[in-house]
Amino acid sequence: MAKDDVIEVEGTVTDTLPNAMFKVELENGHTVLAHVSGKIRMHFIRILPGDKVTVELSPYDLTRGRITYRYK
């Protein structure tokens, strides 16, 4: 899949799950299951409930995503 096929949305982390998975509530009210991207994992950036994040969604599965940015 090409990178320009992704949908970028903002949301808030509501819950942390095992294996670096998070429940994220998007701005439109939907809840998705998101994992951490490799760059965030590599730089040891902590993501906690309540953090505002940017999530990339695949057009093929809108219930799962990848967290690509955590706002300060």
UniProtKB/Swiss-Prot annotation:
Coiled coil: none annotated. Signal peptide: none annotated. CDD domains: S1_IF1. It comes from the Bacteria. Gene3D superfamilies: Nucleic acid-binding proteins. Belongs to the IF-1 family. One of the essential components for the initiation of protein synthesis. Stabilizes the binding of IF-2 and IF-3 on the 30S subunit to which N-formylmethionyl-tRNA(fMet) subsequently binds. Helps modulate mRNA selection, yielding the 30S pre-initiation complex (PIC). Upon addition of the 50S ribosomal subunit IF-1, IF-2 and IF-3 are released leaving the mature 70S translation initiation complex. This is Translation initiation factor IF-1. It comes from Oceanobacillus iheyensis (strain DSM 14371 / CIP 107618 / JCM 11309 / KCTC 3954 / HTE831).
